[in-house]
Swiss-Prot record:
Segments of skewed composition (Basic and acidic residues): 81-102, 205-214
Gene that specifies this protein: SCNM1
Assembly mode: Component of the minor spliceosome, which splices U12-type introns. Within this complex, interacts with RNF113A, as well as with SF3B1/SF3b155, SF3B2/SF3b145, SF3B3/SF3b130 and CDC5L. May interact with LUC7L2 and SNRNP70.
GO MF assignments: enzyme binding; zinc ion binding
Protein name: Sodium channel modifier 1
Length: 230
């Protein structure tokens, strides 16, 4: 950046130099470490007591002090872990995985030691095969051959035995598969029953027919028609 001078006024040159120095100093100060007030002065945002300074040169001198440096360390010590967590979540996950991998052998070893100490008895394994144990010899049964005459008698008895009768289910299935033909009288009785029911007559349970109260009859007959003989 170049400055253009007008005339030979040394005071103007000093003002320009001071402004240039102030711009250079301000470029090295982060925005979150200093605040510019309305009256043109500067306040330090790092120190807890918020000192107010008149010029950038005074702010630069304050920033070089021990109190400001200690406050700066505390400020970034609290702020940096949060930034790292927000910016690098993947890195944090990788570090956790590495820690778990490093601790895994120790955990497995301690787990095995505790299990072996608690379980004194051998573990049951379902894949193990049962060892062969010779069975105790039972009472010997003499299988003497039968004479040929007895063999013939036994075979004759077996051939003469009748076959077992079929159960009730088989009889029912036979009757269902082959229904008996209906007689004419039975058919007439069934037709008469259906006509009475369709006309509005209902049986009272005593062998008589009674008019249904919910049905309207055309005639005033109190007795149902008789069963036709033909």
């Amino acid at each position: 950046m170049s400055f253009k001078r007008e005339g030979d006024d040394w005071s103007q040159l000093n003002v320009l130099k001071k402004r240039r120095v102030g711009d250079l100093l301000a470029s090295y100060i982060p925005e979150d470490e200093a605040l510019m007030l309305r009256d043109g002065r500067f306040a330090c945002a790092i120190c807890p007591h918020r000192p107010v300074l008149d010029t950038l040169a005074m702010l630069t001198a304050h920033r070089a002090g021990k109190k400001h440096l200690s406050s700066l360390q505390l400020f970034y010590g609290k702020k940096q872990p949060g930034k790292e967590r927000k910016q690098n979540p993947k890195h944090q996950n990788e570090l956790r995985r590495e820690e778990t991998k490093a601790e895994a052998p120790l955990l497995t070893q301690t787990r095995l030691i505790t299990q072996s100490a608690l379980h004194r008895a051998p573990h049951y394994n379902s894949c193990c095969r049962r060892k062969y144990r010779p069975e105790a010899p039972g009472p010997s049964v003499s299988l003497s051959p039968m004479p040929p005459s007895e063999v013939k008698l036994q075979s004759g008895k077996i051939s003469r035995e009748p076959e077992p009768a079929a159960g009730p289910q088989a009889e029912e299935s036979a009757t269902v598969s082959a229904p008996a033909p209906m007689s004419p009288t039975r058919r007439r009785a069934l037709d008469h029953y259906l006509t009475l029911r369709s006309s509005g007559w209902i049986p009272d349970g005593r062998g008589r027919w009674v008019k249904d109260e919910n049905v309207e009859f055309d005639s005033d007959e109190e007795e149902p028609p008789d069963l036709p003989l033909d």
